[in-house]
């Protein structure tokens, strides 16, 4: 998977099948249903590919929703913008009166932060990812990736043009840095909020949107 899009169908099916089996064994229950989330704006073919992967792994697919909208379901937002900073993209959903009125995304995400860290310290990507996600290193790392965060804020500013919103909510693991919201607030001149565990919001939103068939209740 690259930037939320399937690039190797066979390996993706194998991976999801293995994870499904491991989780079923750990929980002691069968998991017949699945939902998924996609970056906003991906092609219809990419959406279908994600569904095919889940079906290939033995799931019945109940729903596929865009990532920021999944997050909004958890945050219970009716008016505002949800910005989901994923591994490869920064996506947005704008909501008004509880309805999504705009979605979009652009290819700048956590992987770009990691590449910046790798280049700065001249270390392998995998080592840079560990360094980036080590809480004790946050004060050292954030100045290195601040320009990337500012780019994410600029992307969000572009998405918001023409819309009046009361606040922005940021989710995704890359939003975990303590100074992340202050960079966004400075650029957007809007209140910016981050939940306690931003990494977990979108996955929980996918589960909320699973829409189990009536027979499963």
Where are these regions (language model features)?
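Nucleotide/phosphate-binding catalytic cleft detector across ATP-hydrolyzing
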Residues: 1-85, 97-217
């Amino acid at each position: 998977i690259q930037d939320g899009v399937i690039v190797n169908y066979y390996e993706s099916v194998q991976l999801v099948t293995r994870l499904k089996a491991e989780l079923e064994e750990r929980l002691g229950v069968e998991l017949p249903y699945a939902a998924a989330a996609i970056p906003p704006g991906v092609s219809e073919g990419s959406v279908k590919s994600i569904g095919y992967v889940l079906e290939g792994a033995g799931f019945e697919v109940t729903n596929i929703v865009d990532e920021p909208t999944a997050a909004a379901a958890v945050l219970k937002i009716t008016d505002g913008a949800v910005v989901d900073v994923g591994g490869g993209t920064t996506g947005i959903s704008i909501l008004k009166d509880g309805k999504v009125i705009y979605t979009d995304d652009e290819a700048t995400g956590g992987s770009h932060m990691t590449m910046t860290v790798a280049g700065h310290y001249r270390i392998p990507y995998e080592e840079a990812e560990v360094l980036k996600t080590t809480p004790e290193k946050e004060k050292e790392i954030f100045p290195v990736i601040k320009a990337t965060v500012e780019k994410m804020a600029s992307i969000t500013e572009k998405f918001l043009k023409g819309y009046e919103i009361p606040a922005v909510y940021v989710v995704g693991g890359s939003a975990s840095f303590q100074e992340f919201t202050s960079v966004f607030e400075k650029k957007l001149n809007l209140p910016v909020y981050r939940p306690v565990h931003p990494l977990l919001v979108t996955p929980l939103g996918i589960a909320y949107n699973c829409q189990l068939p009536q027979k499963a209740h």
